[in-house]
């Protein structure tokens, strides 16, 4: 046991530091979803869940615990994979990468906010406006920063993108001592597509259905921005992907608060 703790001290410390954030993020995102989803869809979903769990409090507890478990697994193994790939950097912010990340993230937040005035106009109904309004609640702000900014980057970039890159390296370029850049880029693209696909259930919850324009919105907003987060992870470290994702949400929500 002592040997294990000594050998894996760094990934264990990293993972343990994230668990309180994971607990808060898991609780907040469920609170946010309860305010966000289309009432008819939510009623059916909740009815099925509550029939199994018994109460909203249990639903919140289970959802929170689930996020903590995912964070523990993805944090620990993601750290190890990132180390093998040469992508794990000291978990601190440095001036030049920080400024470059902010220079990218502030315009991204502006672009993301345009969803309200583009797809919000082009798509029938008021689902986009309702989603934006729900995001301006306390639950929406906090879950966007902690779950979107930290947890989603932990799951999708540190773990999934690293796993895909590691598999691509070992399966197709095993003779290379270091993973080729093209493998990591391909892993970023695939992880971004899977990140967007992972938002399809939430998209159905918001819009009640999937149409071609709704699918375009889902993959453009999530997959497109996911590529940027993945590049920041590859260039500077996972903390900059987390920061960029969080800043995107903060900027877009500030714009909606002032102008929408």
Residue ranges and their predicted role:
Residues 33-61, 69-99:
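Membrane-helix interface linkers and caps
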Residues 19-41, 71, 75, 113-121:
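Alpha-helical transmembrane segments of multi-pass membrane proteins
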Residues 2-20, 60-64, 92-107, 239-243:
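Alpha-helical transmembrane segments and their helix-start/interface "positive-inside/aromatic belt" motifs
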Residues 39-59, 125-143, 204-214, 260:
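Membrane-interface interhelical loops and short amphipathic "cap" helices
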Residues 68-86, 155-172:
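Transmembrane alpha-helical segments in integral membrane proteins
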Residues 84-151, 166-178:
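Juxtamembrane helix-loop-helix connectors linking adjacent transmembrane helices
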Residues 59-71, 214-221:
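Alpha-helical transmembrane segments of polytopic membrane proteins
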Residues 139-260:
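Transmembrane helix-loop-helix hairpins at the membrane interface
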């Amino acid at each position: 046991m002592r040997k294990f703790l000594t050998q894996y001290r760094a990934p264990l410390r990293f993972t343990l530091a994230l668990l309180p954030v994971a607990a808060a993020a898991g609780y907040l995102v469920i609170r946010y979803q309860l305010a966000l989803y289309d009432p008819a869809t939510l009623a059916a979903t909740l009815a099925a869940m509550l029939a199994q769990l018994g109460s909203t409090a249990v639903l919140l507890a289970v959802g929170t615990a689930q996020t903590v478990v995912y964070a523990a697994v993805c944090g620990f193994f993601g750290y190890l994979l990132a180390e093998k790939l040469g992508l794990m950097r000291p978990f601190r912010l440095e001036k030049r990468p920080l400024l470059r990340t902010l220079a990218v993230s502030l315009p991204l937040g502006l672009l993301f906010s345009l969803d309200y005035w583009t797809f919000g106009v082009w798509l029938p109904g008021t689902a986009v406006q309702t989603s934006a309004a729900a995001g301006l609640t306390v639950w929406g702000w906090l879950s966007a920063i902690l779950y979107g900014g930290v947890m989603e980057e932990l799951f999708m970039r540190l773990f999934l993108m690293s796993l895909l890159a590691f598999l691509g390296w070992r399966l197709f370029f095993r003779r290379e001592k270091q993973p080729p850049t093209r493998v990591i880029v391909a892993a970023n693209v695939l992880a971004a597509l899977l990140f967007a696909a992972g938002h399809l259930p939430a998209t159905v919850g918001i819009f009640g259905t999937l149409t071609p324009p709704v699918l375009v919105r889902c993959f453009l907003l999530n997959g497109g921005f996911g590529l940027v987060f993945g590049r920041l992870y590859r260039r500077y470290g996972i903390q900059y992907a987390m920061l960029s994702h969080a800043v995107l949400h903060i900027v877009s929500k500030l714009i909606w608060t002032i102008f929408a």
